[in-house]
C-alpha cells in the first residue's frame, strides 16, 4: 500500500467513526429523557441499581435491545455512575446463610408449588452443584467470550455454567410474583444464553454486569407475560360468542372475514367497541376455529389436555395430535406453522396474530389471510373426513 492509499484509508476510517458517533449521539427523545433522569438519580445517590433501570426501561419498553443496553451503560460510565445489584442495606440482608435463605424463600411460595420435598431437594441439589463451579475473573470472561465468538463451544459452555449462580441470585429477588423459583431460574438461564450470544468482549464491559441486564429482562418479561392471563367476565363471553357466530355466518356467505365496520353494523355497536371485544377475544377464542365440512369440530379437540389423568385417554389424544400433524403436513410449511402457532400446537400456548406476524416478519393482516386460507384447506373433504373419523374414535373411547 503506497502513502496516498494509506492517507485515503485513514480519511475513510475517520469519516466512518464520525458517522458512527453521530448515529450514536442521536437518540429518540423518550429514550434520551429517561437516560437523563437515570443520570440525575445516579448523581444524587452516587450509584444506580438495576431496579432503577427497570423502572426507567420496563420489560415492555419498545426499542429495548443490545444497542440501548450498551448506550445506557456508556452514559452512566461517562458520568462516573456505578451500577450496583441492590441498595446497600439490601446487600447486608442478603448476606445470610444460603440454605436458610432458600428455606425462607420457598416458604413464601404457594403450597402447590413446593409442597413436595422432592422439589425442594432437587432445587437444593442444583444450587449445591452450581456452587462448586468457580467464578471467573474479568480477564477469563473476556478470553472465553472471545473464543465463544469464534465458535468454541467449550468456551461458550464454560461462560454459561460459570454464571449460573448469577441467575439464581437474581431469580431470588423475583419470587412471589407469579412464577415458581424453578421457572424463574429457567427464564433467567434463557436470558443468560442470550447475553452470551450478544456479548462483545471488545467493548471492555464485565460480562457478569452485561449478563445481568439480559437475565433480569428475561425474568421480568416472563412475569409480565404471566400477568397478562385474561379472565373474561360472563357478559363479555356472551358478546364474544355472538360476534364469533356472526363472523362465521358472514364468512360462509361471502368467503372472507368481515371488516371491523361490517361487524359493527351487524352487532349494532361502534367500531371502537368491536375492537375492544376482538382484543379481549383473541387469546381466548382462537381454539374455536371450526374444522370439517359441517364445522362441528374445532382445533381445540386436538390439543393435548394436561388435566386428563387416564393413560388410555392421554394416549388417544397423543395419537390424534400425531394424526393432526400428518394433515398439517399436507399444507404449505408456512400455513402449517401459522396454525401450529395460532392454536398452541407447539407448546400449548396460542399466539396472537401480532406475535405470529413478528415471527414471520409480516403484518397481522397477512397472518390472518394465511390462517383463513389454511383453515379453508382443512375443510376440504379429503382432509376433514379423516379428522372427523378420529373425533368419533375419541368419542367412543370417552364413552
Curated annotation (Swiss-Prot):
> Record's domain comment?
Contains 4 domains, connected by flexible linkers. In the active conformation, the domains are in an extended conformation, each making extensive interactions with the RNA polymerase catalytic core.
Q: Where is this region: Sigma-70 factor domain-3?
A: 238-313
Q: Where is the composition biased (Basic and acidic residues)?
A: 11-25
For region Sigma-70 factor domain-1, the annotated ranges are 30-107
Which residues span the membrane? none
Instruction: Report the locations given in the UniProt record.
Output: Cytoplasm
Q: What is the residue range of the motif Interaction with polymerase core subunit RpoC? A: 183-186
Q: Which organism is it from?
A: Thermotoga maritima (strain ATCC 43589 / DSM 3109 / JCM 10099 / NBRC 100826 / MSB8)
Question: Which PANTHER family does the record associate with it?
Answer: RNA POLYMERASE SIGMA FACTOR RPO, RNA POLYMERASE SIGMA FACTOR RPOD
What segment(s) does the record annotate as region Sigma-70 factor domain-4?
A: 327-380
Residue ranges with Low complexity bias: 1-10
Principal subcellular localisation of the protein: cytoplasm
Q: Which gene encodes it?
A: sigA
Q: Which residues bind DNA?
A: 353-372
Physiological role: Sigma factors are initiation factors that promote the attachment of RNA polymerase to specific initiation sites and are then released. This sigma factor is the primary sigma factor during exponential growth.
One MF term in the entry's GO annotations: DNA binding
NCBIfam families, alphabetically?
RpoD_Cterm, sigma70-ECF
Positions of region (Disordered)? 1-31
Q: Which GO terms describe its cellular component?
A: cytoplasm
Q: Which InterPro entries match?
A: RNA_pol_sigma-70_dom, RNA_pol_sigma70, RNA_pol_sigma70_r1_2, RNA_pol_sigma70_r2, RNA_pol_sigma70_r3, RNA_pol_sigma70_r4, RNA_pol_sigma_70_r1_1, RNA_pol_sigma_70_r1_1_sf
This chain belongs to the protein called RNA polymerase sigma factor SigA
According to its UniProt entry, the protein's GO biological process terms are: DNA-templated transcription initiation
Region spans: Sigma-70 factor domain-2: 159-229
Amino acid at each position: 500500500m503506497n502513502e496516498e492509499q494509506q492517507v485515503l484509508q485513514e480519511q475513510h476510517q475517520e469519516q466512518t467513526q464520525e458517522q458512527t458517533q453521530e448515529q450514536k449521539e442521536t437518540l429518540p427523545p423518550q429514550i434520551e429523557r429517561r437516560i437523563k433522569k437515570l443520570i440525575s438519580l445516579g448523581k444524587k445517590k452516587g450509584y444506580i441499581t438495576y431496579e432503577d433501570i427497570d423502572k426507567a426501561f420496563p420489560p415492555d419498553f419498545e426499542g429495548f435491545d443490545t444497542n440501548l443496553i450498551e448506550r445506557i451503560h456508556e452514559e452512566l460510565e461517562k458520568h462516573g455512575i456505578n451500577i450496583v445489584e441492590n441498595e446497600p442495606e439490601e446487600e447486608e440482608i442478603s448476606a445470610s446463610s444460603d440454605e436458610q435463605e432458600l428455606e425462607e424463600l420457598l416458604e413464601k411460595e404457594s403450597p402447590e408449588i413446593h409442597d413436595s420435598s422432592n422439589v425442594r431437594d432437587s432445587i437444593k441439589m442444583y444450587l449445591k452443584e452450581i456452587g462448586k463451579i468457580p467464578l471467573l475473573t474479568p480477564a477469563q470472561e473476556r478470553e472465553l467470550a472471545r473464543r465463544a465468538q469464534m465458535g468454541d463451544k467449550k468456551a461458550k459452555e464454560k461462560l454459561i455454567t460459570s454464571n449460573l449462580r448469577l441467575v439464581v441470585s437474581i431469580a431470588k429477588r423475583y419470587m412471589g410474583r407469579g412464577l415458581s423459583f424453578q421457572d424463574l431460574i429457567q427464564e433467567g438461564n434463557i436470558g443468560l444464553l442470550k447475553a452470551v450470544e450478544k456479548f462483545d468482549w471488545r467493548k471492555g464491559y464485565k460480562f457478569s454486569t452485561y449478563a445481568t441486564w439480559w437475565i433480569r429482562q428475561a425474568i421480568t418479561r416472563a412475569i409480565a407475560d404471566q400477568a397478562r392471563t385474561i379472565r373474561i367476565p360472563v357478559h363479555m363471553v356472551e358478546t364474544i360468542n355472538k360476534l364469533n357466530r356472526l363472523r362465521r355466518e358472514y364468512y360462509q356467505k361471502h368467503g372472507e372475514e368481515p371488516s371491523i365496520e361490517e361487524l359493527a353494523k351487524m352487532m349494532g355497536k361502534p367500531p371502537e367497541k368491536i375492537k375492544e371485544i376482538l382484543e379481549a377475544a383473541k387469546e381466548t377464542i382462537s381454539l374455536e376455529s371450526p374444522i370439517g365440512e359441517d364445522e362441528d369440530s374445532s382445533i381445540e379437540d386436538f390439543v393435548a389436555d394436561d388435566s386428563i389423568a387416564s393413560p388410555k385417554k392421554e394416549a388417544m389424544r397423543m395419537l390424534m395430535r400425531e394424526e393432526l400433524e400428518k394433515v398439517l403436513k399436507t399444507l404449505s410449511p408456512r400455513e402449517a406453522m401459522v396454525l401450529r402457532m395460532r392454536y398452541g400446537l407447539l407448546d400449548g400456548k396460542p399466539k396472537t396474530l401480532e406475535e405470529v406476524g413478528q415471527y414471520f416478519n409480516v403484518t397481522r393482516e397477512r397472518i390472518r389471510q394465511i390462517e383463513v386460507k389454511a383453515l379453508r384447506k382443512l375443510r376440504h373433504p379429503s382432509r376433514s373426513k379423516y379428522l372427523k373419523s378420529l373425533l368419533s374414535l375419541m368419542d367412543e373411547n370417552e364413552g
